[in-house]
Amino acid sequence: MNDSYFEEMTFQCAAYERAKKERAERKAQIAEARGYDSPEMDAWYAEEKAAGPYPYSGGEMKAYWVYKMRRENDGDEFEMSDYCWDKEFHDFIETLRKLGITEFTITNKSTALMENIYGFIAEGCTMVGTHTITKKSLRWGEEEYETAQGILFKVN
């Protein structure tokens, strides 16, 4: 696993969120002091546009959360409990590769599951078969373990 790539993603996301929060606070101050039709607000909008989009795509962030949840839950396996949209497959799988993840289990039970299976295969993954994972969960302040059924994929 590539902890350094994960740490870099964590750092970049935190920096973006801090800057976004500061800009939002500054916008509120400008609106209060000068109003929305002021030159200061125009400058704020230009700054907001220059800040650019979030540093990572939706697919990259889903891979990040797969990695993060495994670390936080002291798990042995990577679980994808969400689903990918069509535009997210490539970035999701590429980020898993960068993170050094060689297999994951999708446990999502949505109607998009079939599309996700085909999307992962199209990105070069191999469907291994059904797989049950055990994961730690926190319920009512108590840690307990539960199982989840899913489909195991190898990231090639």
What are these regions (language model features)?
Residues 1-115:
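N-terminal leader/targeting segments
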Residues 113-128:
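Short, aromatic/basic amphipathic alpha-helical patches
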Residues 126-156:
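C-terminal edge-of-domain segments
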